[in-house]
Amino acid sequence: MAALSCCVPSAEAHDDSHRAGKLTEANECYLRSPDRLSAGLDSVEFGLSGVALSGGRATQRKRHRLGISINAIVAQPIWKSIHSSYLSQSSLFLHLPSFFSYQTKNLSTITMNLKMAAKSLSIVQPVAVPQGTPNFEAKRASLLQAFAEKIPVEYLLPQELIDNPPVDVSGVPTTCGILTAEEIDITETYDAVGLAEAIATKKYTAVAVATAFSKRAIISHQLTCCLTQWFMDLAIEQAKKLDAYLAEHGKTVGPLHGVPISIKDHMPIAGTYSSLGCYLTIVKDDTDSHMIAILRAMGAVFYCKTNQPQTLMHLESDSLWGRVLNPFNIHLSAGGSTGGEAALIAMKGSVLGVGTDIGGSIRAPAAFCGIYGFKPTSPLLPMKGFLATPSAAELNILCSTGPMCRSLRDMDLFMNSVLAAKPYLADPKVVPFPWTGLKTPMNRRLKIGIISNDGFIKPQPPVKRAISWARELLSDPKHADLVEVKEFKPFGAAESWTKIRKMYWPDGGQASRGAIQATGEPLHPLSEWIWKDEAPKGMHNAQDVIMARRERDDFRCDFAESWNLQDVDVILGPAFIGPASAHNTAFYWTYTSLYNFVDYPGVVVPTPIKAKAAEEYESGYVPLSDACKHVKELWEGSNFDGAPIDLQLVARKYHDNELFSALTVLKDILSLP
């Protein structure tokens, strides 16, 4: 009887061989049938112990595993036994180390490297998304299973960690043992500018960088549910071409050569899928959207798409893929609608991402997660080909697209790269705009207005601390030649909040609600909240739209006049009513949506301030409104400990370069990264 002996190295040997990069896509093999094991042999012997078997339905919360010891067993009987008694009709996956030696009848040896795929993927979800109809849940399970089957098992976190995660998961990728020392260095030491330089000088290959960020992204996803798609294979393929080009020509293809960029789910990338956060809207992308085409031509590498809210239109990124968690406190939201990006970047699973913003959807999640986010004046960057553009809301309020990242110079790199491609030539909506960014000179003292509150909602305690911190630094006499600090009172915050909510949904939300419910998908709490608010307003007719736009334009003139009378160049204030919100409670967007209403550029910047569990409102607090009172109740009902605080810097419309000039002044004073 011929035998097949399987020689399995120790766990340490497996780790070393894996870190040496010996696993490749070409060596991938899935054991799905007894034929793949026996290869025509009469019987097969294993010399193994502690082999882990897994199978069963793909779920987000539970992964079935069975640990057994096997000695001198026959392949077909054991396969049939396990298949029938444990896995039913599921495929069998043997989770083994990488290197196997098979001896056949003629005693020749075949050596194979196997990369096993996960059958299911467990994700931390302390607050589950609502369940839909059985038919919808079956479709959803199919999507989740397809995602899981792309993930090599060596990239899975221990089930014990998923079941009992720390409140702050931001450090797990560094300590979990999945990343090599080099991969940790690549993902933690460099910003996008630094990575581009390291690749151009051949310190790292584009393949090494793509591998590092792909691995860290899937680790981050298991902890925060930040992804909708993960396509490491496409990233490696693209990176190999870039490395070959650099080797042959001795130069890069562009300023983003080899830089991995993560992309919000509704931005089409050829060969992937896009959606608006609900099942009915999922479509296959045959071509790149305009922004993606520009970034690809500049050398960017795409490796994942990120989670967003149902319909995109609220500040919590919970969709059929699950709920995105804040890396610094998983009981808090990562924000929306670009919350997946924010969480991924904060986890250092991305160095640079692209978001959209029509009410705060870049700035709020960036602030929730303590990173940079820039909303340009609306017509500066291209959105041709994005799903949901133009949306019904854009009858009245224009959307912006922009970068999210961890350094000032990365925002500048992004803007320089995209605008250098002259996107206005292919998209008439885009305005020709010469970009000077961080090189814009500031030839006079910067007049900066500080916002303590917007006259409608007082910010929660840690945001007040951050404002005080910034004011104290900016008011230091040693900076008197650089900045003049003033108090600033925003015009019409309550009025703009009332008007913009009406203008977002000129159809009363009927189309979006219908698209969700058509498949049996449940309405998520914040989706329900929005439509309860908007349904009474009903469908707008032409006269309603005309009047709303007239009121908007009148407001914009009044806002500009108020700004001019207060005589400031830029304003610095809260990015949100508080730190990251507790799940399902992101009700008030007033500190971001105001600047969408007037279409002013805004950037959120990180501070060293973190929320503390024991913080309280000041004695003698008097609410400015019912909303203000509710915000205090939200603070007292949750634990925000550890949540980062960003502040928001805003300039006049089309003063985007001046905004970046102001950032160069604030960089040293506030020690901005």
What spans do the regions from the language model cover?
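Intrinsic-disorder-associated, low-complexity terminal segments enriched in Asp/Asn/His/Tyr and depleted
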Residues: 16-18, 30, 35, 42, ...
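Acidic-enriched catalytic cores of C-N bond-cleaving enzymes acting on peptides and small amides
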Residues: 117-175, 393-394, 406-434, 438-441, ...
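An N-terminal boundary/leader segment
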Residues: 6-7, 48, 92-244, 472, ...
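Short glycine/serine-rich loop/turn segments
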Residues: 255-401, 451-453, 506, 571-588, ...
